[in-house]
Amino acid sequence: MKYQLLDVARGNRFLSRPREDPTATIIEDDTSSTTNSPYGSDWDIIWLGHCGSYSDPDTRRFVLKNDPTVPRVSDIMYPAGSPEPEELWKQPGTRIMYKSGNGVCSWTYAVSFVGAQKLLNAMSIEPFNQGFDQGLGRLCSSGILRCTHIFPPIFGAHAPAGGANRESDITGHRAGTKIREKGRTHNVLWSTRLNIKNILEGKKVEAQWDGVPDLNDEMKREFIP
């Protein structure tokens, strides 16, 4: 998780720069920049867990390559949409970060102080009659919130073993009496929920899909703007 959020911080600082900024095409550590946060200061939402998103007109992409925690493309679920260009994130071991135009499913998100103020205003003072995640997506697409997405997402919803209707309070009724033999965590290769017993017993964590190489202790990361 620390490795992943370090990558997210670098990507968010890159995307927070003005588009006309000539240094926005250069990846650097940014540790000399004046900021109150490792994630930068010019953002409202970092959407880390979702079930799909679309990019806004900003065509910049921060590409994270050689990430062993990225699921295979065949294992990724994104029913609500995916960003362009697909050829970037469909490369093995690759995630991309981008300025988001919309998103669905508020599984995990970070909010800046200013972003929290904007959310409170939008959802309590201004007219608001949507589900939270749909409303959050609308606030991103309208430009009220400055939002960054990562795809494939780092966090996913967990569907436990047992009755499939337990998966969601919204859509669980559609599952009827179907039984899920094994739990699953959407878009997470090494799921903490599925590995709780292994973690408690000091054993190696297991991927939730077959045919995945073991996770090395060290992640060798590469960044491409």
Residue spans for each PLM region:
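An acidic/histidine-cluster motif and surrounding catalytic segment
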Residues: 2-225
